[in-house]
């Protein structure tokens, strides 16, 4: 993967800004969905000594999908390379990804609805560093 591909969805552009926290640029696929679930629930379980706080509220809050099309269109105006018409089927893709993550979590006896923020965050983390569309041109 080309370096520029890692930052294709960073808007505003992040290079040169101060970063605090771990480098998530290539975390996608490095850990299982269950690992991310547990890490966000209680980081010390999977990373002893971690100073990361837990994020318990994302396990209860549902994601808000009603604004997804508008958010996609806004990102397109900023130059994010979503394909034409993606705003209209983004929630369908979101649901497919969410259902796949829930299925993976069930393999480890973790039960949660596909509409929770934790599922969206796991989907996001699993994509980090895996989008190589620019390199394929």
Predicted stretch roles:
Residues 5-16, 99:
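Surface-exposed acidic, glycine/proline-enriched linker/cap segments
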